[in-house]
Amino acid sequence: MKYSICKGVLWQETDGEIVIVAPKQDPAYLNESGSIIWKLIDKGYDETKIVATLSKEYSEDDVIIRKDVNDMIKDLLKNEYIKESN
């Protein structure tokens, strides 16, 4: 599944971390790994490609990475920072 950043959502990277600002939401602060996932979503990567990219970057089990990516995507969708796209 591919995702895109929702209209009206702004973000800025500062010191390796991303701050997300969206209408009707408090700012969200992403840590380093969350920031990497956010930037890959912004580049148009699908969930599988995000997991593969992170697996190459970190020496962590794919199952753990997939769960972390999935959890973050669910949270971003719930807060309407991203949406499903084609």
Feature locations, PLM:
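Acidic, low-complexity/disordered tracts enriched in E/D and polar residues
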Residues: 1-42, 85-86
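Long, charge-rich, low-complexity alpha-helical segments
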Residues: 29-86
